[in-house]
C-alpha cells in the first residue's frame, strides 16, 4: 500500500491534442472558401444506477479531461482530453449551456448545426436529449431558445420574415420512418445538385411557439420503437432525428433567402448480445443498430485518413449524417458513458470513437440564395420570341406597312435588355476593365456618338452581348449559304455519262434552271425516294443514288420552284458483311487485349472485360453475345457493330464500283 501511495500511476495521453474552438463564418472574409470548423466533442458521465457501491472505472480530472483504468496494466490509467467533460453531478442545464446553446446563433446566419448523442445502451443518451418534465434535455431547451431568438430578431425591425418548421423521423432496421406520419412507410434519402441531403415526402410542421412544438413532438415521440433488454428496460431500438428548419426571406431588394437546419440526433446504443440476451426481433434490431454504428466508425476513420471515398452510402444513418460529419454543419458530439465496471469495454469503445471524431473537419457556409420571384424570367411578347422570318409573317399587312423602323427598334432593344438582365447581373470585374480600355481607345481615335460607359452597367453589358450574338448569327448564315452553293456546284459538275447510266424515277422539272437563286428565303425538304436498285453482284460495295425535291421560294417571286437534287449513299453486299462479321467474331475470340483495343468503341476497360469473360465462359458464338459481358449494354453492342463492320468490310474491298 505504501509503495502504491508513493508511486503515482503512470498516465498515457490519449487524444490529448486539442485544437481551438470552431470558427464561424466571417462576414468580412476575403476568401470564398468556407473556414474550417472541427467537430466539437463532449463526454458526460452518468451517476451509478445501482445502490451497491463499487469503485468506478472512470474518474474525471478537470472540466476537459478524464481517466480510465487500464485493464492491461494495473498501475496505468488511460487519459482522454476533450472539449468538455461533465461529471456525475452535472445537470442538464450545464450540458446544454456549455455545449449546445452557442451553436444556435449559426442557424439565423443561414448555416447548419448538428447535435449527436452517442454511447452504449443504458448510458443516458435519451435522458440527455429528451430529459424529463422536471429536468428537460437538449431538445426542449434548444427549441425554446431558438423560438425566442426568432422572436427577438423579428422584434428588432430587421427586414426579414422568419419561419420555423420541424420534422421528426427514426431509422429502424435501415428504414427511414416518419414519426409525424407513421403511415407514410419507408422514405428515401436523396441528394440535390448542391450536395444537400433531403428526404422527399417527409412531413414538415410549422411552429411558432413552444406549445405548438409540444403538440407535434410529444405524440410523435410515442411512435418511436423501444424495447426491454437485460441492460435497459426502455432501450431505444432506432436512431431518432429531429430536424428543425429556419427559413428567412428578405422583404427588400435583393430579396435574399437563407435556410439553416438543426439536426438533434439520439443514436441507439451499441449492444453486446451475449449480455443483453437478445433473441428474435430484438436480435435483428441489435444487428441493424450495430451495423450502422460500425459504418459510422468507418466514416470517421476515412475522414481522418483523408481517403478519396467516404462510405456515407453504406448505411441510412451515415447517409443522413453526411452533412454533420465532414460536411457543412457546426457539429457537437455528446458521448454518454457509464461508471460501472460491467460497462468498461463499452466505455473504452465510446471514448475511442469520440477521440477520433474530434479530428473530423467540417466547412460550414451560409446557405443563401435569391428568392424565386426575384429570379423570374421576363415574359416577352410572342413576336419577340419568334425568329426574323416568323416575326415578319406574324405581323399583319397593316402593321407591316405602317410600322416605322424607329418605332419597332426601340421595343426590341428594351426586351433584349430585360431578357438578358439576370444573366449579366454578376459580371466579372475583369470584363468591366476591358470595357474601360475599349472606351479610352475609341476616344483616342476620335470616335463620335454616345460614350459606351454613359449607359448603366447592366444595360451596357446587354448591348454588347446582343451585338456579339447578332455577329455570330450573321457568320452562321454566311457559312450555311456557302455550303449550299458548294453542294449545288458539285452536283452540276458530275459526269453527264454517269448521269445517263443511272436510272431515275424523278423527272427533272422544266421550270428549274441551272442557276442558283442567291437570296434563299425558305427551303422545304421532301421525303427521300430510292432511285437505283441493288446490283446483283454480292461481293462489292455499291453506291446508291438518292434523290429528293426541294422547293425554293425566291425573294422576288411568290411562286415556288421545284429542283431535283441527287446525292450518293453506300450499300454493302450481305456476303461482304458476313465476312466482316466473321472476321470480327474471330478477333473477339482469338485476339489479345491489345488487339481488341484496335477496334472502334473498345478501350482498355472493355478489352479487359471481354478477355476475362472469354476465359470464364469460353468463346463467343456470335458478336451479339457481347451483351452477356457485365458492363456492356445492348446499345453499346449495336454502336460497336456499326462502327467496326463497315471498316472491316471496306478493308476487304479495294473501293466502290
Swiss-Prot record:
Gene3D superfamilies: AF1531-like domain, Kinesin motor domain. PROSITE patterns: KINESIN_MOTOR_1, KINESIN_MOTOR_2. GO terms for molecular function: ATP binding; ATP hydrolysis activity; DNA binding; microtubule binding; microtubule motor activity. Residues 16-33, 402-415 have a biased composition (Low complexity). One of its GO terms (cellular component) is cytosol. It comes from the Eukaryota. Residues 38-360 form the Kinesin motor domain. It is found in: Nucleus; Cytoplasm, Cytoskeleton. SUPFAM superfamilies: P-loop containing nucleoside triphosphate hydrolases (SSF52540), RuvA domain 2-like (SSF47781). ATP binds at residues 119-126. Ubiquitinated; mediated by SIAH1 and leading to its subsequent proteasomal degradation. Residues 457-502 form a coiled coil. Belongs to the TRAFAC class myosin-kinesin ATPase superfamily. Kinesin family. Interacts with FAM83D and SIAH1. Kinesin family member that is involved in spindle formation and the movements of chromosomes during mitosis and meiosis. Binds to microtubules and to DNA. Plays a role in congression of laterally attached chromosomes in NDC80-depleted cells. This is Kinesin-like protein KIF22. The gene is Kif22.
Amino acid at each position: 500500500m505504501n509503495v502504491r501511495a508513493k508511486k503515482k500511476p503512470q498516465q498515457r495521453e490519449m487524444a490529448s491534442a486539442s485544437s481551438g474552438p470552431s470558427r464561424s463564418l466571417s462576414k468580412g472574409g476575403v476568401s470564398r472558401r468556407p473556414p474550417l470548423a472541427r467537430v466539437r466533442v463532449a463526454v458526460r458521465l452518468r451517476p451509478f444506477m445501482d445502490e451497491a457501491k463499487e469503485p468506478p472505472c472512470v474518474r474525471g480530472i478537470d472540466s476537459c479531461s478524464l481517466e480510465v483504468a487500464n485493464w492491461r496494466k494495473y498501475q496505468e490509467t488511460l487519459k482522454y482530453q476533450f472539449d468538455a467533460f461533465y461529471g456525475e453531478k452535472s445537470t442538464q442545464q450545464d450540458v446544454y449551456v456549455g455545449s449546445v446553446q452557442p451553436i444556435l446563433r449559426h442557424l439565423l446566419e443561414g448555416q447548419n448545426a448538428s447535435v449527436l448523442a452517442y454511447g452504449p445502451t443504458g448510458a443516458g443518451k435519451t435522458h440527455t436529449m429528451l430529459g424529463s418534465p422536471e429536468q428537460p434535455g437538449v431538445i426542449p431547451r434548444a427549441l425554446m431558445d431558438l423560438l425566442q431568438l426568432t422572436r427577438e430578431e423579428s422584434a428588432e425591425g430587421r427586414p426579414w420574415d422568419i419561419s420555423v418548421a420541424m420534422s421528426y423521423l427514426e431509422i429502424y432496421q435501415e428504414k427511414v420512418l416518419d414519426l409525424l406520419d407513421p403511415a407514410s412507410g419507408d422514405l428515401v434519402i436523396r441528394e440535390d445538385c448542391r450536395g444537400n441531403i433531403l428526404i422527399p415526402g417527409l412531413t414538415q410542421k410549422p411552429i411558432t411557439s413552444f406549445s405548438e412544438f409540444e403538440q407535434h413532438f410529444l405524440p410523435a415521440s410515442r411512435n418511436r420503437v423501444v424495447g426491454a433488454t437485460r441492460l435497459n428496460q426502455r432501450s431505444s431500438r432506432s436512431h431518432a432525428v429531429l430536424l428543425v428548419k429556419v427559413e428567412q426571406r428578405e422583404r427588400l431588394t435583393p430579396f435574399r433567402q437563407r435556410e439553416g437546419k438543426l439536426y438533434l440526433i439520439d443514436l441507439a446504443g451499441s449492444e453486446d448480445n451475449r449480455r443483453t440476451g437478445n433473441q428474435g426481433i430484438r436480435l435483428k434490431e441489435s444487428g441493424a443498430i450495430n451495423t450502422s454504428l460500425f459504418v459510422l466508425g468507418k466514416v470517421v476513420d476515412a475522414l481522418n485518413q483523408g481517403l478519396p471515398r467516404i462510405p456515407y452510402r453504406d448505411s441510412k444513418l451515415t447517409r443522413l449524417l453526411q452533412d454533420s460529419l465532414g460536411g457543412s454543419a457546426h457539429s457537437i458530439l455528446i458521448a454518454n458513458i457509464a461508471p460501472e465496471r460491467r460497462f468498461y469495454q463499452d466505455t473504452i469503445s465510446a471514448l475511442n470513437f469520440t477521440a477520433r471524431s474530434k479530428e473530423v473537419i467540417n466547412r460550414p457556409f451560409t446557405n443563401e440564395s435569391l428568392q424565386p420571384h426575384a429570379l423570374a424570367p421576363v415574359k416577352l411578347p410572342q413576336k419577340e420570341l419568334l425568329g426574323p422570318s416568323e416575326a415578319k409573317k406574324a405581323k399583319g399587312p397593316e402593321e407591316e406597312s405602317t410600322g416605322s423602323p424607329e418605332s419597332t427598334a426601340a421595343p426590341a432593344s428594351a426586351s433584349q435588355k430585360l431578357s438578358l438582365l439576370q444573366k449579366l447581373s454578376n459580371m466579372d470585374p475583369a470584363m468591366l476593365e476591358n470595357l474601360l480600355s475599349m472606351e479610352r481607345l475609341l476616344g483616342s481615335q476620335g470616335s463620335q456618338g454616345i460614350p459606351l460607359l454613359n449607359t448603366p452597367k447592366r444595360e451596357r453589358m446587354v448591348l454588347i452581348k446582343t451585338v456579339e450574338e447578332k455577329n455570330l448569327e450573321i457568320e452562321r448564315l454566311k457559312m450555311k449559304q456557302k455550303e449550299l452553293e458548294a453542294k449545288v456546284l458539285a452536283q452540276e459538275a458530275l459526269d453527264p455519262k454517269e448521269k445517263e447510266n443511272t436510272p431515275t424515277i424523278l423527272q427533272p422539272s422544266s421550270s428549274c434552271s441551272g442557276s442558283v437563286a442567291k437570296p434563299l428565303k425558305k427551303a422545304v425538304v421532301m421525303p427521300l425516294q430510292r432511285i437505283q436498285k441493288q446490283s446483283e453482284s454480292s461481293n462489292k460495295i455499291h453506291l446508291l443514288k438518292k434523290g429528293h425535291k426541294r422547293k425554293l421560294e425566291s425573294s422576288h417571286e411568290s411562286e415556288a420552284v421545284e429542283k431535283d437534287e441527287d446525292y450518293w449513299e453506300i450499300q454493302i453486299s450481305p456476303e461482304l458483311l458476313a465476312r466482316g462479321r466473321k472476321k470480327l467474331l474471330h478477333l473477339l475470340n482469338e485476339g489479345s487485349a491489345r488487339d481488341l483495343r484496335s477496334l472502334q468503341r473498345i478501350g482498355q476497360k472493355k478489352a479487359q472485360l471481354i478477355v476475362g469473360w472469354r476465359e470464364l465462359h469460353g468463346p463467343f458464338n456470335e458478336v451479339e453475345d457481347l451483351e452477356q459481358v457485365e458492363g456492356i449494354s445492348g446499345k453499346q453492342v449495336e454502336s460497336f457493330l456499326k462502327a467496326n463492320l463497315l471498316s472491316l468490310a471496306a478493308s476487304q474491298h479495294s473501293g466502290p464500283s
